[in-house]
Amino acid sequence: MKGLHLHGVSHAFNGNRVLDNISLTVPAGELVCLLGPSGCGKTTLLRISAGLEELQEGQVTIDETVMAGPGRHVPPERRKIGLMFQDYALFPHLSILANVTFGLSNPKSKETRYRAMEMLEQVNMASHAEKHPHMLSGGQQQRVALARVL
């Protein structure tokens, strides 16, 4: 089945187990929100799914392709997973458009820039493409972060 699948994911920091045998399936096209108390492992699970954190135990598959497991780690840029954290993590020295294209395989290509502008249009931020993050309100910065995820 297409989608994100986590199988038996466990993770520890300095011997403190924060994830213990977690299994989760998110069908393709679904939007998911993880809820739980501070420190319960939500962000760690997301970081493992996206490839930002090395998997210690278990397996992560996307569209039936193993992304992480014993002896395998596909880098984040090849996983096609977008995350939006509380801190929007916009780069202050980059324009809004450059923030949206950052990390993509060919950020300066016409196609990438066109697609990024489409995403900025979806969140009503295309007119701010050449501005820098400090010139935007918090809500506007959040919409830029959403465009980057999309």
What positions do the PLM features span?
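Hydrophobic anchor residue at the start of the ABC signature
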Residues: L146
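The feature captures the beta-strand-to-loop junction immediately N-terminal to the Walker
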Residues: L35-P37
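Conserved ABC ATPase "signature" region
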Residues: T65-A68, K108-H128
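ABC-type ATPase nucleotide-binding domains, specifically the catalytic core motifs of the NBD
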Residues: V32, E54, L94-R113, Q122
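Helix-to-loop junction immediately C-terminal to a conserved catalytic motif
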Residues: A50
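ABC ATPase NBD Q-loop/coupling interface
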Residues: Q59-R79
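Conserved ABC ATPase signature
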Residues: H73, H132-L136, Q140-Q142
